[in-house]
């Protein structure tokens, strides 16, 4: 049985026994909610998400493209793949580089 994580995101249909799953485990989520694209899923239960955004350069009064990469935990019930558009939520630090967890994955159109 999936628990309510406090967001308007439906629980995944699959069950998992991951302790770090916000739906089936005991991991509380809080803080930032971000959307990005999965660029790597080679690590065990981890995905790398890339976010692209525009930054204003005040000297030239123009915008420049920037990007950032974030490591996030990928529960077995969600199992996001490369190219998926995912929603990640901040949580407590899971490891040295992971402080986010994937809560929703969509296949791009």
Curated annotation (Swiss-Prot):
Keyword Ribosomal protein belongs to the record: yes
GO cellular component, one term: cytosolic small ribosomal subunit
Entry keyword annotation includes Ribonucleoprotein: yes
Gene Ontology biological-process entries: translation
InterPro entries: NA-bd_OB-fold (IPR012340), Ribosomal_uS17 (IPR000266), Ribosomal_uS17_arc/euk (IPR028333), Ribosomal_uS17_archaeal (IPR019978), Ribosomal_uS17_CS (IPR019979)
Keyword entries, A-Z: Ribonucleoprotein, Ribosomal protein, RNA-binding, rRNA-binding
Coiled coil start-end: none
GO molecular function terms listed in the Swiss-Prot or TrEMBL record: rRNA binding; structural constituent of ribosome
Pfam families: Ribosomal_S17
Recorded family membership: Belongs to the universal ribosomal protein uS17 family.
Function as written in the Swiss-Prot or TrEMBL entry: One of the primary rRNA binding proteins, it binds specifically to the 5'-end of 16S ribosomal RNA.
Oligomeric form and interacting partners: Part of the 30S ribosomal subunit.
Cited NCBIfam families: PRK08572.1, uS17_arch
Alphabetical list of HAMAP family matching this protein: Ribosomal_uS17_A
Name of this protein: Small ribosomal subunit protein uS17
Organism the protein comes from: Methanosarcina mazei (strain ATCC BAA-159 / DSM 3647 / Goe1 / Go1 / JCM 11833 / OCM 88)
Record lineage: Archaea, Methanobacteriati, Methanobacteriota, Stenosarchaea group, Methanomicrobia
């Amino acid at each position: 049985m999936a628990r309510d994580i406090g967001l308007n995101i439906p629980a995944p249909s699959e069950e998992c026994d991951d302790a770090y799953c916000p739906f089936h485990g005991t991991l509380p989520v809080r803080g930032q909610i971000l959307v990005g694209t999965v660029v790597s899923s080679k690590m065990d239960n981890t995905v790398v998400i890339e976010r692209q955004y525009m930054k204003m350069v005040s000297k030239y009064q123009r915008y420049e493209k920037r990007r950032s990469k974030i490591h996030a935990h990928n529960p077995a019930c969600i199992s996001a793949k490369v190219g998926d558009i995912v929603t990640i939520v901040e949580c407590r630090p899971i490891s040295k580089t992971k402080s986010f967890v994937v809560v929703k994955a969509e296949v791009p159109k």
